[in-house]
Amino acid sequence: MQWEIEFLRWLIENLHNPLFDWFMHGLTFLGEVAWIYFLVSFVFLFFKKTRKTGIACIAALILIAGFNLFVFKYIFKRIRPFREDNFLYDYVIARFKNNNMFNTYPSETSYSFMSGHTLSAFLFATIVSIYHKRTLIPNMIIASLMSFTRLYYPFHYPTDVIAGVLTGVAFGTLTVLVANKLEIKIKKTIISRKNRKLESIEK
């Protein structure tokens, strides 16, 4: 949509400066292939209070973010905005391809819809926030900043990012609901097996 292109052009013309560039570069690098979320999730596994959170995050990132990256994007095949507009293209090429700072330049064959950075950020933020409610505000701030980098550097349309936010929150919530039900079922199964063993011993 033309309004999305105009919005991205406006961001470049009005918000870009060396300080913001440095900060946004770092954030968008951390979101590459969701590696930072996997790293934190694996750390969660080592602590009893966060183990369940870690398992839920890893499962969601693999299944949902992975599906978006390897399947969903190729269903829609939406071309990235900087490939549709000469002004955006010239900016990205000058900024990234000839510099490749932090290796954040999207591959030539990658598609735009929906934003994987945004989806992963809000999946992770939603799951962690539900299990650890006190972390809600910082989680959502970080996820929002991560998502904004995809607009600050015109790798995605605004609607790509909005879709990533909504999908991340929805499936993050669904992941927790499913995980809680599975946990209850597993606990019941374990208790049932223990009871059967006790009954067999008593006989």
Located regions from the model:
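N-terminal transmembrane-helix/juxtamembrane module of multi-pass inner/ER membrane proteins
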Residues: 1-38, 69-105, 194-203
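Membrane-helix interface segments
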Residues: 19, 49-54, 82, 131-138
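Alpha-helical transmembrane segments of integral membrane proteins
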Residues: 24, 52-60, 135-138, 159-163
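Hydrophobic, aromatic-rich transmembrane alpha-helices
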Residues: 37-48, 121-129
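Interfacial segments of alpha-helical transmembrane regions
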Residues: 40-71
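Membrane-water interface at transmembrane helix exits
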Residues: 44, 68, 72-77, 129, ...
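Small-polar-interrupted transmembrane alpha-helices in polytopic inner-membrane proteins
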Residues: 59-75, 136-150
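Membrane-embedded catalytic cores of phosphoryl/pyrophosphoryl-handling enzymes
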Residues: 96-203
